[in-house]
């Protein structure tokens, strides 16, 4: 029985993010790493999240916090709306909206994530959360105002 990938690609999970999350393959670019990390949140795979965080971030110290967060969060969907590279292709950025429910409330993470490529492998470094006015267009591309979409 096939299952669509949680990353929103509309591709079967086994053909999409599973090879990265399982360690069979290394994500070839920041967008694939972002999508596979989202899948790891959905599937509650702290090991993959820690492995794909840049070593300088000390992600192993966040293991208990990650696992505790899994119990209270249901991920609803991911929309990637921009990705780009800099510094000869060794630094990448992915902008996205990740929707979730937590404690009965719906929310969204809107982030521009920064990735670094070292020794042929991409790592998540950090992210910034852009500020949007309530009447600005939603960055997810829905055509709605931010306040009526991801800003709820």
From Swiss-Prot:
- HAMAP family cross-referenced by the UniProt entry: UPF0225 (MF_00612)
Which organism is this protein's natural source?
Escherichia coli O1:K1 / APEC
* Record family assignment: Belongs to the UPF0225 family.
Taxonomic placement: Bacteria, Pseudomonadati, Pseudomonadota, Gammaproteobacteria, Enterobacterales
Check the record and name the Pfam families matching this protein: SEC-C, YchJ_M-like
Instruction: Please give the name of this protein.
Output: UPF0225 protein YchJ
PANTHER family the record matches: ADENYLATE CYCLASE-ASSOCIATED CAP C-TERMINAL DOMAIN-CONTAINING PROTEIN, UPF0225 PROTEIN SCO1677
Q: Where do the coiled-coil regions begin and end?
A: none
* Chain's gene name: ychJ
